[in-house]
Curated annotation (Swiss-Prot):
The keyword Protein transport does not apply. The active site is at 188 (proton acceptor). It is an enzyme of class 2 (transferase). The gene is cmk2. InterPro entries: Kinase-like_dom_sf, Prot_kinase_dom, Protein_kinase_ATP_BS, Ser/Thr_kinase_AS. This is Calcium/calmodulin-dependent protein kinase type II. It catalyses: L-seryl-[protein] + ATP = O-phospho-L-seryl-[protein] + ADP + H(+); L-threonyl-[protein] + ATP = O-phospho-L-threonyl-[protein] + ADP + H(+).
Amino acid sequence: MSILAGFKNLLKHSKSSKGRSNASKSVDVSVNRDVAAYTELAAKNVNAGGDEEIRVANYPGLEKYQLIENLGDGAFSQVYKAYSIDRKEHVAVKVIRKYEMNKKQRQGVFKEVNIMRRVKHKNVVNLFDFVETEDFYHLVMELAEGGELFHQIVNFTYFSENLARHIIIQVAEAVKHLHDVCGIVHRDIKPENLLFQPIEYLPSQNYTPPSLEPNKLDEGMFLEGIGAGGIGRILIADFGFSKVVWNSKTATPCGTVGYAAPEIVNDELYSKNVDMWAMGCVLHTMLCGFPPFFDENIKDLASKVVNGEFEFLSPWWDDISDSAKDLITHLLTVDPRERYDIHQFFQHPWIKGESKMPENFTYKPKLHGTPGGPKLSLPRSLVSKGEIDIPTTPIKSATHPLLSSYSEPKTPGVSSVHEAMGVAYDIRRLNHLGFSPEQLSKKSMNTGSIKELILDEETTTDDDDYIISSFPLNDTLGSEGKDPFSLNLKESSLYSRRSAKRVN
């Protein structure tokens, strides 16, 4: 039994049990609009993730919200699904334990809140309210009922080009608004930070799974402008890494008008193109099911990211259009001056849905189809039945404020993709700050976390630019600096199964 099969069973169980739980605890909110009554109801609600009743905490400052269930836990926070008495709709409430944070971390919360307040876009999670009490910060945000896009990639193994295009265009619309209207770069665009509003699932007629993926689920009928696979509107979340690169009032890079140094202007270009690089990673991951950069050794991984060493591996990319590969290549170009900006992105034929290839076709595929070829690394998308460890209760994520209702199994396959992507994204940010691959490897083990590296570089000169990293590096490095999760192609049962079918 594959990890994906086990994961799918878990999702089905979670969805059905959650439906029963929601039905059993539904409350007629029209009975009483009194604040005290809602406060009492909040204390009686239970966590929908398990059978055992767990009381949802009642926090000062949230009297206008009925807390319904705990969606997940973070390093300093908990996220709840709640009902807003004033708005008369469900919202997500992020409760941050202020008393556990130092000055820099508290500044980071205010920076994130201030950035979210200036962004209003249909593809960005909306911040409705911010409440500060003596011990807590409360962020009241738009609720994305579908959860993280990452879980849907795992659920469907990979997406069709139509669905991937539907998603990445919405991400790009949000990025364009951030860059051109708000003067903001996100700097942490990845599947875990892309949420979605669900749509009705419409099964395909006479669906036949791909020969190389006989267990691949049907993502359903694709409807232009609506979506497929239950995925509708996309929302970018988590602005903990984001940065203001120009002042909206002056429409210039941050600083006095006419006095911006060339390096400040260049920093705007480089910063924006970090988001474009991340979009390339997301598109690559959606189309094949694993990220473009991965390696067993952190130093080698850093080198691959910095030098743009990725491959369109066969057989995974055999049936994907050359036009899609060309777009990804332009997005993952090492030199940010040569990398596509957001306007070039929208002009690409693949984004427009055109069948023609670009005139200057640039991608150079590196295909390795046999285990006997050069050593490659690949996240283990499938594992044996004995390796599956499906938890009885939902596993809480510490990396994202708004969590999917899906429960994530503790398996090498899923966690490997999470970790590989997290390392690659953080390395790219550090490279933007001027670190070489050798420095990245050395400093990573000395400081113990990428968070500390970025914090040292960015907060020594600007307290307002504090960022919170969600990826502690010492979680992936052993005592000798070796990576404990396996990313070797030869050990991948996904690769083995596909190769066997090609031979037969």
